[in-house]
Amino acid sequence: MSIIPSNIEIDFTDEQISPSAGSIFLSEMAKKMGLREELNAAIKIKKRARGSSDTEMLLSLIYSLAQGDGAILDVDRLGHDQTRCQLLGLHRVPNHRRLGEYLGRFDDNTCGRLEKVAQSQASKVIESVVEYERETKGYVPVFIDGTAIEVTGDYFEGAGKLYDGNTGYWLHAAFVGGLWVTQRFQKGGGHVAHEVKDLLKETAEMVGEGHPVWARFDNAYYRNDVAAFCRERKWDYSISVTSETFKRPLREMMSDFIEEDWEAINDDGTEHAAFLYHRPSGWKQEQVYVVVRSMYEGKQRLLYPRYTFILVSREDLPLAEIVKRHRGKQGQENVFKGPLIHLDLHHPPCGTFNANRAFYSAGQIAQILLVAVQMKLLPKEAYKHGIRTVIRDIVRVAGKLVRHARKWKLLFSKSALRLYWLSHAADCLLSSG
């Protein structure tokens, strides 16, 4: 490799070069999933055919978010990249002010319709996700959780007190594997598990019957109706029990344990587990619990053992396997953090509640598109990676658009880090027409 000389002249060109030429895979996947048609049929806000249409407004936001640009201002970056707009099939990209004003016109009905579009898009990817999870894990992990979306300032409609005293909204979401299948953006001040039954029903409809589902929940979902729903669907489940009130009767039952009651669940014998049986107040039937006794925090031995309690649906599996499956919840918690971090969805951009609600639905669709690219266009080795890798190594790859013999051609550099992934994705598009 030759050394770059120090006296390089910097100049500019009119050639069609984009730092995000990998966006073509987003637009092609959106085309295959009928996203434009669904948005066009569901969202009718604009009254005049002037400027960007409803569909172009939303697609501009979705594609901007899918690149990890979570601020409304970032849509201006998209609008100035004409090559990227051409690859995405966008004729008119709104500036950030127009887009903000447009989101402010959403009401409950249009927000609900946009949420349905997101669910419809997820239903077109979920089969691939379920197949992969069954192949690699032997079961389909489902995770439902709520997270606080904090805001600062006095101009956020519907923001209220959160569990930690801060002000903000609640975002409740359901994931199947790494796919964000459904969500509810809610006003602050409510319960973290509000509308969990609706999320469960929508998730169950998408997953379908006949799959070995393992649903995982935090303490907020330690409720009889949640466990009953899972039993009715023949889902396995595990729920963390962290409230001191709920743990008290379980601790009392442990007083009769002897050392032989504990079973080692790791190779070095630093963790043991045992089954407990208890009927919580208000529940009709006795429930099965697993208690985990940990002697170490990393490599540091604890002065006293730490006990973790988990409500479980099964006792026919080895204790080590049950604990392993429940701890996989952490991986899906990270999947939930993925859109918030990598799509930069931590900060609601609008002052009105429904505008922010629409914004997070667009964020969900962006995540679904990224997972669809990952599962349908990339090789299997890419499935284990998070969406951050897809954004950085596929979407944000520079390319040059050229026209020769009346045909358009997109050129990527052969020095791209994930060149094989790009080649595989291009071959998939070519073979599918």
Q: Model segments located where?
A:
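Short amphipathic alpha-helical "interface-anchor" segments enriched in bulky aromatics
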Residues: M29, V75, E263, L319-V371
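Flexible loop/turn segments at secondary-structure boundaries
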Residues: Q82-C85, I149-V151, G190, Y221-D225, ...
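Dynamic "connector" segments at or just before major functional cores
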Residues: M1-H191, V196-G208, Q374, E381, ...
